[in-house]
UniProtKB/Swiss-Prot annotation:
Belongs to the GcvP family. It comes from Pseudomonas putida (strain ATCC 47054 / DSM 6125 / CFBP 8728 / NCIMB 11950 / KT2440). GO terms for molecular function: glycine binding; glycine dehydrogenase (decarboxylating) activity; pyridoxal phosphate binding. It catalyses: N(6)-[(R)-lipoyl]-L-lysyl-[glycine-cleavage complex H protein] + glycine + H(+) = N(6)-[(R)-S(8)-aminomethyldihydrolipoyl]-L-lysyl-[glycine-cleavage complex H protein] + CO2. The keyword Secreted does not apply. This is Glycine dehydrogenase (decarboxylating) 2. Its cofactor is pyridoxal 5'-phosphate. The glycine cleavage system is composed of four proteins: P, T, L and H. The modification N6-(pyridoxal phosphate)lysine is found at residue 707. The glycine cleavage system catalyzes the degradation of glycine. The P protein binds the alpha-amino group of glycine through its pyridoxal phosphate cofactor; CO(2) is released and the remaining methylamine moiety is then transferred to the lipoamide cofactor of the H protein. It is an enzyme of class 1 (oxidoreductase). Its EC number is 1.4.4.2. The gene is gcvP2. The keyword Oxidoreductase applies. The lineage of its organism: Bacteria, Pseudomonadati, Pseudomonadota, Gammaproteobacteria, Pseudomonadales.
Length: 957
């Protein structure tokens, strides 16, 4: 009889599970042994409160292997019909240069990095973002730009908030041109609702009739009209109001920059700079403003500073103005935004350079001119006198026949009322595209030829007064890398400066830097997902609908909620969307007075900022000495609020890294007083398969798909923050003005520009759940095991600040460095910088408690990597002891000088510790050395000498 294993024995039940989990069964058992317990189940019983446990498998389909999951998802992609979409409205066909596609978008060195809070190990993407800012500064004609926002519509809402904060006109009204994109107007409506602003949507011809603190103008407008904005801007300035302009970035290559026309704020999308439409996202918005408003600007700003040796170094500037610092005083809850996509757009400009961009923009405009000339020659009336790439046409009774012809040619046009059609050309269009359009509008026997039309002496589409005269992108970085060889090497040089997950663990607490598996990432560039316009007819997006519906059903099964709203395109947007749904719910019950939001003192800064944006008054609830919500204080404040109580925002497990025993009672108290419970989903990775937010008592919660469900952080975005909702809140979530959500009131205004947010990255989370199935619980259990293992190994050297039941932590733990700082002067920042010399990104610094490090290892890190981190931390503790014992001076030791660079090696060495101790402090580092690009960055200098544009090349030498 054969002794070889049977086919059944050789068939793995869940082959992806062992790829996703870092520690194998043997390593897990060794970690359990170190904790003095026998099994993972015993650990979970000791850690998770029994009254919230989900004591059954998740109701999910059995896990698929990688090939089967890819095949099923490919079937969905094939159901999507990729037509030529000439709808416009802020979304356009574009060509992603393949050198950027392969070496940035598909490169884990770029997409697995985190927000550059530790600039010494992020100089590559900081330089890329500085390039992005310089591109925006040059094209808009304004002196200051940020490093991206979420999308054009939310950027417009941010502009409105900025205008209210800084304008001298104290009106409570904001004006929006009725010819702005409809999705932008909808998001403005939502934001104005939360802030209590009056939003006036009207013709710009009536602007002078209104007293406003600011206005939004579209350039060119949604129908393609290129209007001289100077008279409108002068009118606004005469009443001390701000002029905000939403501008098509490619058009600014040939149009006069809005800054030169007098605009105070310019914003828009960079999607058509090489970023696929992706059924709505993700795309990087841009935002530029006058220098006077720098402290009111939303989002991250990259600035130039210097390091400890005086060399040029980049960093995130003016961070004290951000939401996590200003909390309930913030005008914005924007956290990180769309860094990966901003980098792609910036690299698109680097690769093409000013001449390349001019060629692209002029070609798009010329094709549009030729189309306009042909249609005009045959009597079709154009409604916009001037244009860049968009024509709005009056075709009268021929509209239906033209639409039918366009559909037969697989071309999507913008369908407007009253016999009007819109057509927007883009970089992907050719002469053949124009000929097909002439056939569609005029019939195949029109007799027109492209060459002849190109030679017609007709009025130009852009008036002479609005032709761009100002040079742009003169900096060398936009003029040196136009061959693929040079571009490839430039991208690699930048990548090598950064530390990402493809090199080492990133143990950032509250960030869940887990594996972003290759099989999860591959589908996002498939044309069936990448090339769809978000406003394409539903029949062309059947595959997207099937995939999203299935993902929503899975997320409901995982969380216990009744429905999912996919529109929020970040975690902070999810918070805002959920709170707005709560506000609308209370108003529907004739309880508009319910505006008070209770938030624990430990909450992330986005929580109070989001509540303030939703029109709520924030009341802080104390935490006790164990880091838990003070139940007595909660009860007292809920009672005091009474009928004014709107909701409680709470993170679970808590931001202190423990499962609070009283979470059910906390929810019950809020419900007793008529409030709703908003559960921040930042720590959902410690709940999946073990507990469900809705079962615990949450009414609404956002899910960070870029944490728990494997969408990569991209160096600071993209992300997705869909919300799960109980049935009673479902009628009040965001809909969309262009693609209404079935079953919702179409008057429910939007929170994001696209109906399903950043839809093209949803396949990542779909793949993760499809390949894990009910074994998602294993990921949560191993994440908890890894965190407890680190706590046990490090607790003697660095006290763990908070522990839960049985002295266990959840999926992360807080190491308290304050006693050591008091003894030695060595701070949490010194330890964070010294970890770079050991090849690690630091844990989260000083959140949620100043003077601490919060460590989250995730389930994806092997025991060997965890042990390497433990070795590094214990070695650092030994170095601190050397300082404490007086063997090294308090200000002249490896921690105070960290990180160490090649410049230190090449310079004069006169420090009281060896060069080897400085740059090669462990055996692993001696074999796998990562060199920080700069020494410690001087933050104070950078803010006092703010400079947020590209510096001369000589500065890097």
């Amino acid at each position: 009889m054969s002794q070889s294993p049977s086919l059944h024995q050789l068939q793995e039940l869940n082959p992806f599970l062992r790829r996703h989990l870092g520690p194998d069964a043997t390593e897990q058992q060794a970690m359990l042994n170190a904790l003095g317990i026998a099994s993972r189940n015993e650990l979970i019983e000791q850690t998770v409160p029994p009254d919230i446990r989900l004591n059954r498998p998740l109701d999910l389909p059995a896990a698929l292997d990688e090939q089967a999951a890819l095949a099923k998802l490919a079937g969905y992609a094939e159901q999507n019909q990729v037509w030529t979409s000439l709808i416009g409205m802020g979304y356009h066909g574009t060509i992603t240069p393949t050198v950027i596609l392969r070496n940035v978008l598909e490169n884990p060195g770029w997409y697995t990095a985190y927000t550059p809070y530790q600039p010494e190990i992020a100089q590559g993407r900081l330089e890329a973002l500085l390039n992005f800012q310089q591109m925006v500064i040059d094209l808009t004609g304004l002196p200051l730009a940020n490093a991206s926002l979420l999308d054009e519509a939310t950027a417009a809402a941010e502009a409105m908030a900025l205008a209210k904060r800084v304008a001298r006109n104290k009106s409570n009204a904001f004006f929006a041109d009725e010819h702005c994109h409809p999705q932008t107007l909808s998001v403005l409506k939502t934001r104005a609702e939360g802030f209590g602003f009056e939003l006036i949507v009207d013709s710009v011809d009536n602007l002078a009739k209104h007293s406003v603190f600011g206005a939004l103008l579209q350039y060119p407008d949604t129908h393609g009209e290129v209007r001289d904005l100077r008279p409108l801007i002068d009118q606004l300035h005469s009443q001390q109001a701000l002029a905000c302009v939403a501008a098509d970035l490619l058009s600014l290559v040939v149009l006069a920059p809005p800054g030169e026309l007098g605009a105070d704020v310019v914003l828009g999308s960079t999607q058509r700079f090489g970023v696929p439409m992706g059924y709505g996202g993700p795309h990087a918005a841009y935002f530029a403003c006058r220098d006077d408003y720098k402290r009111a600007m939303p989002g991250r700003i990259i600035g130039v500073s210097r390091d400890a040796r005086g060399n040029t170094a980049l960093r995130m500037a003016l961070q004290t103005r951000e939401q996590h610092i200003r909390r309930e005083k913030a005008n914005s809850n924007i956290c990180t935004a769309q860094v990966l996509l901003a980098n792609i757009a910036g690299f698109y400009a680097v690769y093409h350079g000013p001449e390349g961009l001019q060629r692209i923009a002029q070609r798009v405009h010329r094709l549009t001119f030729i189309l306009a000339a042909g249609l005009e020659a045959k009597g079709i009336k154009r409604l916009n006198q001037h244009f860049f790439d968009t024509l709005t046409l009056n075709v009268g009774g021929a509209q239906a026949a033209i639409i039918e012809s366009a559909e037969a040619a697989h071309i999507n046009l913008r369908i407007l009322g009253r016999g009007h059609l819109g057509v927007s050309l883009d970089e992907t269009c050719t002469e053949q595209t124009v000929l097909r359009l002439l056939d569609i509008f005029l019939g195949v026997d029109h007799g027109l030829e492209i060459t002849a039309l190109d030679q017609l002496a007709l009025p130009e589409g852009i008036p002479a007064s609005l032709v761009r005269r100002t040079p742009f992108l003169a900096h060398p970085v936009f003029n040196l890398h136009h061959s693929e060889t040079e571009m490839l090497r430039y991208l690699k040089q930048l990548e090598n400066k950064d530390l990402a997950l493809n090199q080492s663990m990133i143990p950032l607490g509250s960030c869940t830097m887990k594996l972003n598996a290759t099989s999860e990432m591959i589908p996002i560039t498939w044309p069936g997902f990448a090339q769809l316009h978000p406003f394409a007819p539903a029949a062309q997006a059947a595959g997207y609908k099937a995939m999203i519906d299935e993902l929503e059903s899975w997320l409901c099964a995982i969380t216990g909620f009744d429905a999912i709203c996919m529109q929020p395109n970040s975690g902070a947007q999810g918070e805002y969307a959920g709170l707005m749904a709560i506000t609308r719910y209370h108003c529907s019950r004739h309880q508009p007075m319910r505006t008070l939001c209770l938030i624990p003192s430990s909450a992330h800064g986005t929580n109070p900022a989001s509540a303030q944006m939703a029109g709520m008054e924030v009341v802080i609830v104390d935490c006790d000495n164990d880091g838990n919500v003070d139940l007595a204080d909660l009860k007292a404040k809920a009672h005091a609020a009474g009928e004014r109580l709107s909701c409680l925002m709470i993170t679970y497990p808590s931001t202190h890294g423990v499962y609070e025993e009283g979470i059910r009672e906390i929810c019950d108290v809020v419900h007793q007083y008529g409030g709703q419970v908003y559960m921040d989903g930042a720590n959902l990775n410690a709940q999946v398969g073990l507990a469900r937010p809705a079962d615990i008592g949450a009414d609404v919660s956002h899910m960070n798909l870029h944490k728990t469900f494997c969408i990569p952080h991209g160096g600071g975005g993209p992300g997705m923050g869909p919300i799960g909702i109980r049935a009673h809140l479902k009628p009040f979530v965001a809909s969309h003005p262009v693609v209404p959500v079935p079953g919702l009131d179409p008057n429910n205004s939007a929170v994001s520009a696209a109906p399903w947010g950043s839809a093209s990255i949803l396949p990542i989370s779909w793949m993760y759940i499809a390949m894990m199935g009910p074994q998602l619980a294993d990921a949560s259990e191993v994440a908890i095991l890894s965190a407890n293992y680190l706590a046990s190994q490090l607790g003697a050297a660095f006290p763990v600040l908070y522990r839960g039941r049985n002295q266990r932590v959840a999926h992360e733990c807080i190491l308290d460095l304050r006693p050591l700082k008091a003894l030695t002067g060595i701070s949490e920042e010194d330890v964070a910088k010294r970890l770079m010399d050991y090849g690690f990104h630091a844990p989260t610094m000083s959140f949620p408690v100043p003077g601490t490090l919060m460590v989250e290892p995730t389930e994806s890190e092997s025991k060997a990597e965890l042990d390497r981190f433990v070795e590094a931390m214990l070695a650092i503790r030994a170095e601190i002891d050397e300082v404490q014992q007086g063997n090294w001076p308090a200000e002249n030791n490896p921690l105070k000088h960290a990180p160490h660079t090649l410049a230190d090696v090449l310079g004069v060495w006169d420090r009281p510790y060896s060069l080897e101790q400085a740059v090669a402090p462990s055996a692993h580092v001696r074999q796998h050395k990562y060199w920080p690009a700069v020494n410690r960055v001087d933050n104070v200098y950078g803010d006092r000498n703010l400079f947020c544009a590209c510096v001369p090349v000589e500065a890097y030498r």
